[in-house]
């Protein structure tokens, strides 16, 4: 009975370890234009994509997915290290974009001009009324940066940032702080 009891304990321990490890591995892919994920705990920043582009993707993939392919209603411009996406209906300010650094994507952003294309929780954040509504949707931020011109709510160790600047809302995803 002693050996069998220890064996069952080892099996239970191994199963719990697999369960804990699988929750980190099973983070959902989050395509900003398609995914209906409503809880930020269900994805990692590295799993967020903008028209198929994720943090860490190569410049070649950015060219293939954003620059060469025509996205309906979207105008694409390359500005220095940024690939900016504009709404063709009113191309005054960028609605989304990525930054390339050393040939890889290290930053993705979307603004409230992107809300009509966004899905899931970020559609609600971009259409929201402000900081308190964002906190209701995403939960309490890990830390806040406040100044006279903007407020930054930092989530996921600072790799996901919600920036409020006047009436503008920007959601930023980055490789790390």
Model-based region annotation:
Residues 12-20:
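Bacterial N-terminal signal peptides
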Residues 25-27:
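Boundary at the C-terminal end of the N-terminal hydrophobic targeting segment
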Residues 29-46:
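Short N-terminal segments immediately surrounding and downstream of signal-peptide cleavage
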Residues 47-53, 116-125:
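Second-shell loop/turn segments in exported
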Residues 104-107, 120:
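Mature extracytoplasmic domains of secretory-pathway proteins
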Residues 109-116, 175-177:
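Short, solvent-exposed aromatic-acidic interface loops
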């Amino acid at each position: 009975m002693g050996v069998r009891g220890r064996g069952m304990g080892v099996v239970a321990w191994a199963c719990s370890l697999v369960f804990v490890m699988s929750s980190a591995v099973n983070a959902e892919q989050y395509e900003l234009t398609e995914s209906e994920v409503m809880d930020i705990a269900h994805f990692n920043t590295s799993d967020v994509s903008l028209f198929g582009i994720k943090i860490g993707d190569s410049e070649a993939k950015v060219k293939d997915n954003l620059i060469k392919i025509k996205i309906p209603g979207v105008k694409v411009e390359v500005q220095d290290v940024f690939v900016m996406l504009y709404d063709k209906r009113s191309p005054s300010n960028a609605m989304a974009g990525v930054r390339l650094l050393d040939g890889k994507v290290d930053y993705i952003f979307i603004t409230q001009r992107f809300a009509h294309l966004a899905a899931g929780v970020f559609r609600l954040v971009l259409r929201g009324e402000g900081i308190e509504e964002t906190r209701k949707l995403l939960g309490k931020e890990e830390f806040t940066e406040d100044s006279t011109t903007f407020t930054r709510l930092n989530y996921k160790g600072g790799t996901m940032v919600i920036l409020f600047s006047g009436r503008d809302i920007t959601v930023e995803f980055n490789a790390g702080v």
